[in-house]
């Protein structure tokens, strides 16, 4: 993975898991919203920074709950463009994650 892409994702996350909102530890993963098996690439819009547990270990994790994850934009179908697929943030806001590292807010969340 390109270090600049990984760094942009980490900067966007601002030290927090992008699914639960808690502070990140050193035990985190860069999750492909459009899975590699679905044609997903290493792009800023396609990657989110998450706790290892939120990624694939805990009962509430992305991979163990694909329907919830797809509804929240944490996982994206093969025909979808991650940069154009809404993503639900921990505060409830609904955003588009862009490849330049910016976030376009569609619906404001709780502050």
Predicted feature residues:
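Short Cys/His-centered divalent metal-binding micro-motifs
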Residues: 22-25, 47-70
């Amino acid at each position: 993975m390109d270090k600049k892409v990984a760094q942009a994702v980490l900067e966007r996350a601002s030290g927090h898991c992008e699914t639960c909102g808690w502070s990140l530890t050193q035990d985190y993963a860069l999750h492909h919203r459009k899975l590699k098996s679905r044609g997903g690439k290493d792009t800023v819009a396609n990657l989110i920074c998450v706790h290892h547990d939120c990624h694939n270990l805990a009962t509430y994790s992305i991979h163990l709950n694909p329907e919830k994850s797809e509804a929240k934009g944490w996982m994206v179908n093969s025909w979808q463009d991650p940069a154009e697929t809404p993503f639900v943030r921990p505060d409830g806001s609904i955003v588009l994650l862009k490849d330049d590292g910016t976030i376009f807010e569609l619906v404001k969340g709780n502050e």
